[in-house]
């Protein structure tokens, strides 16, 4: 598969496939690093495609096995003068694998062959201005809201400005595809679901924000979730905007 950044929630996406067996063993060792204690708003949503609705959510008794593909870090848009710095990859990869395991998505092996390929991307996107217009607005919103830019929950009305913000953001995107060894033009990658989590980058480097982003995205893995705003304070996670799980008509 060729490497390509995520955009929206199409039915297919080619990503960079890597040899991951040895890396997977490494990622399963260790634990999450300490999360920052500062309050911040985070937007979470998950798109589920029509093919994705045919897959039953994994359980402890019947987990789903996957091949991980780490698209990794990207800096998109304009150059940010503040709070833009590449974090180390390994702790993020480890945290993502552990988060997926909490939702019963486990790395595949010879004993347990894969049914999924799960691609993980993180980074920072900054607006590009031309004559006071943000010309990469669609790209920013694709990473924040996916395919659900007009599907806010009623309780999220007060946070519409946060969800539609075009200021610079740190983001995490986790995408699940039906597994195949080698996609072709006749048999392209089939997207099943894509989870998005993002937060404004002002005040924190991505290294400080990524673990809370993974934490708030975890319950939304594989579950149709309307865009919702979650507030993290120093005592833990407090849900303010309701991330409503429901059946969505996404093709």
Question: PLM features: residue spans?
Answer:
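A structural "domain/chain start" motif
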Residues: 33-93, 97-98, 110-116, 120-133, ...
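Surface-exposed patches in mature extracellular/periplasmic domains of secreted proteins
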Residues: 102-115, 225-233
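N-terminal secretory signal peptides that target proteins for export/translocation
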Residues: 1-17
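Envelope-exposed proteins and targeting segments
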Residues: 62-64, 103, 114-116, 168-173, ...
């Amino acid at each position: 598969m060729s490497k390509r950044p995520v955009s929206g929630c199409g039915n297919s996406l080619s990503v960079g496939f890597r040899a991951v067996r040895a890396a997977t063993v490494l990622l399963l060792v260790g634990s999450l690093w300490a999360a920052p204690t500062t309050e911040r708003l985070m937007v979470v949503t998950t798109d589920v495609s029509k093919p994705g609705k045919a897959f039953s959510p994994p359980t402890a008794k019947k987990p789903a096995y996957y091949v991980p593909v780490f698209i990794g870090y990207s800096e998109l848009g304009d150059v940010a003068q503040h709070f833009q710095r590449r974090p180390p990859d390994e702790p993020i990869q480890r945290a993502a694998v552990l988060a997926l395991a909490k939702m019963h998505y486990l790395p595949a092996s010879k004993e347990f062959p894969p049914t999924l390929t799960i691609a993980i991307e993180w980074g920072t996107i900054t607006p590009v201005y031309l004559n006071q217009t943000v010309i990469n607005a669609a790209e920013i919103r694709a990473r924040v809201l996916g395919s659900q830019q007009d599907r806010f929950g009623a309780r999220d009305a007060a946070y519409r400005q946060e969800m539609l913000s075009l200021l610079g953001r740190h983001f995490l995107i986790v995408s699940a595809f039906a597994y195949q060894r080698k996609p072709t033009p006749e048999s392209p990658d089939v997207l099943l679901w894509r989870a998005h989590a993002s937060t404004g980058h002002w005040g924190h480097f991505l290294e400080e924000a990524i673990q809370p982003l993974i934490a708030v995205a975890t319950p939304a893995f594989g579950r149709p979730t309307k865009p919702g705003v979650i507030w993290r304070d120093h005592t833990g996670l407090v849900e303010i905007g309701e991330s409503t799980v429901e059946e969505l008509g996404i093709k």
